[in-house]
A protein has these predicted regions:
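Ligand-binding pockets and gating/stacking loops
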Residues: 1-171
């Protein structure tokens, strides 16, 4: 009974987060005009969205609804602005080409520029670290759930990787 209540409360938390994202958007006409959103229920914050998706994977594993899941943190040519990461400006794809720092390459938005390759690489590394932190949060969440004397993490195989070792060189 306790396990079922714990599981159902986790589902309710996800539902509350989805409802909050909708209410926040509706309460701010300015925000509503500025954002082009994929649909209702998706949080404004990319971190909130990512955590919500990871939480749904946790819930699916916990309920034994699936034994396999894939999740792409971001695709390689993402033009998502990463300004939500402290100390970062520009898009993920542009930052991956950190050796080109003048803001005039086909991968840049034509507005953002950086003072050096080192500055741009530092920002790229901050975004990469942010992605790692999201995976760390997911692993901690799996580790926090006990099933049959073991954590859900102990009963899982997690593979985390990237399609490239160097985004600038496409290698």
């Amino acid at each position: 009974r306790r396990k079922l209540e714990e599981y159902l409360e986790s589902i309710r938390r996800v539902e509350r987060r989805l409802a909050f994202a909708d209410r926040r958007l509706e309460a701010s006409p300015k925000l509503k005009r500025q954002l082009r959103r994929p649909g209702p229920g998706i949080p404004d914050s990319h971190q909130d969205y990512m955590r919500l998706m990871l939480e749904m994977i946790v819930l699916a594993f916990w309920a034994d609804a699936t034994r396999i899941s894939t999740f792409m943190l971001d695709h390689g040519q993402s033009n998502r602005y990463c300004n939500f990461v402290d100390g970062v400006k520009g898009t993920w794809h542009a930052l991956s080409h950190w050796r080109d720092y003048d803001g005039k390459t086909e991968d840049d938005d034509g507005i953002t520029s950086w003072s050096s390759a080192e500055e741009k690489q530092r920002m790229y590394n901050l975004v990469t670290r942010w992605h790692h932190e999201q995976v760390g949060w997911f692993l901690e969440r799996l580790a926090s759930i006990r099933e049959n004397g073991k954590s859900l993490l102990d009963q899982s195989m997690i593979v985390y990787g990237s399609s490239l070792s160097d985004g600038h060189a496409h290698s």
